[in-house]
């Protein structure tokens, strides 16, 4: 990265630019598109890569599933009846698939247009399930990343590729985690032999074996999930998601040639802080399900180290960092990594979550389906895996063993009940196993590169207010109590 401090104008950069957005149906991508349409009307074109779904074309998906979201209400208020004209002029829907070579483009004329018109590509496509099927995660997060890069290389005018990854490609590292790239084949535990081509071959061979024996769809899914977790843990990553995202980084980082590349690593992404309005969110994250589960009276304990730092970042700040990094790095023919998080400059301990959940639901208690107000009480904190196992044993496992014994004595009279509770408890243990690395995470994400990026835009006055992403401005109590939880309850739960 250049040592000379520059001043970046995002609006000037976006003027007359054509941008390909990959993974356009996703949470961040929607906010990215809305932001550009709202603040940069002089952008030339946004090409949105979407897959057609059963019974719906890519264009129908955009109109029915994306544009009708509350997220776009500010844009609708701004443009009124002219919004349709704006979207028809500025947006081109591209029917494609990141998992396929050339992004699965079937429209030759459109592909030709994009190859000669696109100035920048932002890859926001990802499957974020920790235990996703290995074939699916590898196809999207790893090989899909390569497909996007290869398409970028074909584009005559492309000056920048922004690949959005995750800060947690670091696995379970502790201490200060630097903004450094992965070498091809690098592993977290030193185990040698990581070969992405072999991983691809392994997946295909396993799928072929399952199909030959006529395995049921459920068996194929579970086998693929287990394979992904095994391969991830073999090389030191805690789950399939971060393992395949790390391999995706390896792919684009080592094969980019002279293309300018931004690897943007956000931490845990939460609801919008300010724009287009506070509290917009989609999907369920660990901290969200814990807080709301407690408020609904379904959760009586939290499992985490209260003194560990939780790194969260509002979605609009992440989108702003993407826009600024794109403008700052276009045409520089280098690779740079940005951690976009809060743990270094505005750390928040895990202890905040149970405290704020109690404060919120004490003042605004949840009303259940029967119309009864759910009163919350003090929550039990399990500060280690040992205390969790002890809690589960006393509260559930002893009773389950008793039920199993009675079931055997009475010739499986209670088999249905036993299987139900056994499955439920096993599911809890599986969830805890998946999330444990983040409930007891002891890393702090260095963001030296990102801080330089903030300084570049901070000198531009109006744009500093427009493209904010400094975590130091966040008051965590105010954000969670008056923005995030309200958004969760309105849009998700």
From Swiss-Prot:
It comes from the Eukaryota. One of its GO terms (molecular function) is alcohol-forming very long-chain fatty acyl-CoA reductase activity. The keyword Lipid biosynthesis applies. Expressed in leaves, stems, flowers, siliques and roots. Detected in epidermal cells of leaves and stems, in trichomes and in the elongation zone of young roots. Keywords: Endoplasmic reticulum, Lipid biosynthesis, Lipid metabolism, NADP, Oxidoreductase. InterPro entries: FAR (IPR026055), FAR_C (IPR033640), Far_NAD-bd (IPR013120), NAD(P)-bd_dom_sf (IPR036291). The keyword Electron transport does not apply. SUPFAM superfamilies: NAD(P)-binding Rossmann-fold domains. It is found in: Endoplasmic reticulum. Disruption phenotype: Glossy stem wax. Major decreases in primary alcohols and wax esters, and slightly elevated levels of aldehydes, alkanes, secondary alcohols, and ketones. Its EC number is 1.2.1.84. GO terms for biological process: wax biosynthetic process. It catalyses: a long-chain fatty acyl-CoA + 2 NADPH + 2 H(+) = a long-chain primary fatty alcohol + 2 NADP(+) + CoA. One of its GO terms (cellular component) is endoplasmic reticulum. Belongs to the fatty acyl-CoA reductase family. Catalyzes the reduction of fatty acyl-CoA to fatty alcohols. The preferred substrates are C24:0 and C26:0. May be unable to use saturated and monounsaturated C16 and C18 acyl-CoA as substrates. Involved in cuticular wax formation. This is Fatty acyl-CoA reductase 3. It comes from Arabidopsis thaliana. The gene is FAR3.
């Amino acid at each position: 990265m250049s040592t000379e401090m520059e001043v970046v104008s995002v609006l000037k950069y976006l003027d007359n630019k054509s941008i390909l957005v990959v993974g356009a149906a996703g949470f961040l991508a929607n906010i990215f598109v809305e932001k550009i349409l709202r603040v940069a009307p002089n952008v030339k074109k946004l090409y949105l890569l979407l897959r057609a779904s059963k019974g719906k074309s890519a264009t129908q998906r955009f109109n029915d599933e994306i544009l009708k979201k509350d997220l776009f209400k500010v844009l609708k208020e701004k443009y009124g009846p002219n919004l349709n004209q704006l979207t028809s002029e500025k947006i081109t829907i591209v029917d494609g698939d990141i998992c396929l070579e050339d992004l699965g483009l079937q429209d030759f004329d459109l592909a030709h247009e994009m190859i000669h018109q696109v100035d920048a590509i932002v890859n926001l496509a990802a499957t974020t399930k920790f235990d996703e099927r290995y074939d699916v995660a590898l196809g999207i997060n790893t090989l899909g990343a390569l497909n996007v890069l290869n398409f970028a290389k074909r584009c005559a005018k492309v000056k920048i590729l922004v690949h959005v990854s995750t800060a947690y490609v670091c696995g379970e590292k502790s201490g200060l985690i630097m903004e450094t790239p992965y070498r091809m084949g690098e592993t977290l535990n030193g185990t040698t032999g990581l070969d992405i081509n072999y991983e691809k071959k392994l997946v295909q061979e396993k799928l072929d074996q399952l199909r030959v024996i006529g395995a049921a769809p459920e068996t194929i899914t579970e086998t693929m999930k287990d394979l992904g977790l095994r391969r991830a843990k073999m090389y030191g990553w805690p789950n399939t998601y971060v393992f395949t995202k790390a391999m995706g980084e390896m792919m684009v980082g080592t094969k980019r040639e002279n293309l300018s590349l931004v690897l943007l690593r956000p931490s845990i992404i939460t609801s919008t802080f300010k724009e287009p309005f506070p509290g917009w969110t989609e999907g369920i994250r660990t901290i969200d399900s814990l807080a709301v589960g407690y408020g609904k009276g379904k959760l009586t304990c939290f499992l985490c180290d209260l003194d560990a730092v939780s790194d969260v970042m509002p979605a609009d700040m992440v989108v702003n960092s993407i826009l600024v990094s794109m403008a700052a790095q276009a045409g520089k023919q280098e690779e740079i990594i940005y951690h976009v998080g809060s743990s270094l400059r505005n750390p928040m301990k895990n202890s905040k979550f149970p405290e704020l959940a109690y404060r919120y639901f004490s003042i605004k208690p949840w009303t259940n389906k029967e119309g009864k107000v759910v009163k919350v009480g003090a929550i039990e904190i399990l500060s280690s895996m040992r205390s969790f196992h002890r809690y589960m044993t006393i509260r559930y496992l002893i009773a389950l063993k008793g039920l199993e014994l009675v079931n055997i004595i009475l010739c499986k009279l209670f088999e249905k009940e036993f299987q139900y509770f056994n499955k439920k408890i096993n599911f809890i243990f599986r969830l805890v196993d998946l999330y444990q690395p983040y409930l007891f995470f002891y890393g702090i994400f260095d963001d030296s590169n990102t801080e330089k990026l903030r300084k570049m835009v901070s000198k531009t006055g109006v744009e500093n207010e427009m493209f904010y992403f400094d975590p130091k401005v966040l008051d965590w109590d105010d954000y969670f109590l008056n923005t995030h939880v309200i958004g969760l309850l309105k849009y998700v739960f």
